[in-house]
Amino acid sequence: MTNLANAKKEELVKMANFKCHHGHSGLSHPACYFKNNGVKEKILFFDIEAEDLNADYGIMFNWYAMDEDGNKFEDYITLDDINKYKSSDRNIEPKEDSRIVKSLIDLMSKYNRVCGHFSCGYDLPFTRSRAVIDKIDFPAYGTIFQSDTWVILKRKFKLSRNSLENGCKKLIGRSRKDRLSLSIKHGCLRGEKWAINLSRKHCENDVLDLVELFKATNRFMRRTNSSI
């Protein structure tokens, strides 16, 4: 059991009475509770694609994820999402990504650790920001742990660039990395399938590279209990 929504009453009582080394109960820091009680860690590798690097200037287009068992997940905006939030009011916050932001958060909540590349600086803060803007609940501090292959490269290796592409090329010998052009991003904003499909493939390739890079490098660094 790694999702509080699936917890039985007896388990919730145990979690409420538990105190971790941070001074929190198992309800506020469930990841600490799971670790202390020998619950097997479940890792979700993920990546997002968005209109802009800042969540107040762009929406999420799509996301892709894979767990350690090879289960694959994804979601992406559709023309229905775009039409649902169509407005001529200049003061309305764009919320076309509300559905896929929620589906990503729902998936993340089923795992006790997530991993991305520079996810500590981009994917997670962006998703959290979009969730708050879209009025969607985001997991509280201490709920889910995080790992980041960018941090591993930065602290344990000495490369000219700590990008996912460079890390994979130099340490693994290949990278699937491509680039999303401005025309593709604008196509995504219009809900055009050709653009969305290219963004989906780009995101999938990033996650495949991420998983390979994590497997090649994670043994060189202690797995910390840093919260999302």
Indicate where each model-derived feature is located:
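N-terminal accessory regions of nucleic-acid-interacting proteins
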Residues: 1-42
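Two-metal-ion RNase H-like nuclease active-site motif
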Residues: 41-52, 203
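Conserved beta-strand scaffold positions in the cores of enzyme catalytic domains, especially
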Residues: 43-45, 72, 144-146
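RNase H-like nuclease fold core
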Residues: 50, 54-85
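Metal-dependent phosphoesterase core characteristic of DEDDh/y 3'-5' exonuclease domains
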Residues: 58-68, 113-227
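Nucleic-acid-processing active sites and adjacent nucleic-acid-binding tracks
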Residues: 71-105
